[in-house]
Amino acid sequence: MLQTKDYKHFCVGDVEFEGASAAAKALPGDRVRVEDGRVVEILERAPHRNIVGTLELASKYRYGMTSKNHPIYLFSPFTESYPPFYVGSAHKDTSQNVLAIIDFAHWTETCPRGNLQQILGVAGDLATEEEALAIQASPLRWKKLEALVSPTPIEAHMKGITFHVDPPGCKDIDDAITLNPLDGKTEVSIHIADVASWLLANPELMSKAEQIGQTLYRDGVAIRPMFPIELSEGIFSLLPGEDRRAVTLRCVWNKAEKKLEAFTWSLEMIRVTQSFTYHSVSKSMFASELEEICSGIANRPVTDSHEWIEQLMLLYNREAAKVLREKGAGVLRRHAGLDQARYDTYERLGLPADKLAMAAGEYCAATEDDTRHWGLGQDVYCHASSPIRRWPDCVNQMILLGHPANASIKHMNTRAKSFKVYERDMVFVRALLTNHDKTLKGTIAESGRIWIPSWGRIVKSDTIGFEPGSVVAIQYFCDATKRNWKRRLVLKLEPIETITSS
């Protein structure tokens, strides 16, 4: 399979080569045959659909006419792994470039031909740019669903007061909690929505959900859900007052010994009877017990209600990972830890080294030797607590329930990276298109890397003339000629002293 990040440097398996001409009109993802450092045959085209980019209507250049006598324009994909395309359009207003979606058609000319699927709007308009980034990150959407087959009924019903804790307005509710008093102890039940049973009863849902990978959120609102809304905010969701299936981790909090014991798993019916926000739960009848239990889980005082729920979900995921490891199936989450040299440098400069020098996590098979999650200090860890919004959790839930489940680890990691790119680009597009004062303060972290606290991230840029630790004033601009927001962001650095003395 042909792989490339820039359509200049290519690899197929262990063979690397350079130059677009050597790719011989193959596109990323195509199955190809390579001889002597070049593609000699395209064995199978990948489905190149939903390609997002800029249709250059405002350019003075045209590249011919279509069979319907429409002008052909240059289309520049956001993704640099694709070359520019020729795309015909009947759009009347050619005074401004537009953002559009195309599908690959064929490649017989200098550039591949694309079929225009949709014009999103004018390039440079914030709403249009945000929608384009969302489609780039998560291009697939659900169409109308057929009636679903219900899973086999289950008899076990949870007793007690079951509650969920989520932000106001949350509808895709993955998790709920039940605390039942025992003699000097507390039975703790962590319930996660049973999505797996619905998938097993309706396997047609699996393929598309896997391709989508996870729910995309904008400002806390699900804008491109992994499952159709009627499922993610309906029959899958642990909505108050509704009987719902749940995969439950149950254990007992021993108050005297300050520890959890007697862990068991079960599939059962629950009904959420109380809803809390993170603010209201801290004032509820459960607050003191949640604080005590979650402080015991963390082995330190935990007073923030957000972290109460976080600790319970971490516990669920740790215990699920142990089951997956024992079964030799499923998907774990590993983390390589710190770049020690970078950590030492950043700490010396007074930067948030724990965050900035941390390696990215990744998915791996439960059978691999190296599964250590350095950040959490766990030999095994997994994602299992959010099956409504994340595909690896669905795979792991199926295995927890005793069913086989196939998983493409590479695809999971690719999808996760796409969502990280979306988060980065949203910071850039909003900064460039909404802020009137385009001046920031930053710190040179190392050569070519600047820490910008107000953005909460490291940005790559030319730092020649500045030593690590230098505090700089940053003016930033948009170079609209570049393909994507990572390239469009242009920084100009000046020493703080120069700015303040002028």
Placement of each model-derived feature along the sequence:
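Charge-lined substrate channels and their catalytic hotspots, especially those that engage the 3′ end
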Residues: 1-192, 196-242, 304, 465-466, ...
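Structured core elements
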Residues: 33, 101, 115, 162-164, ...
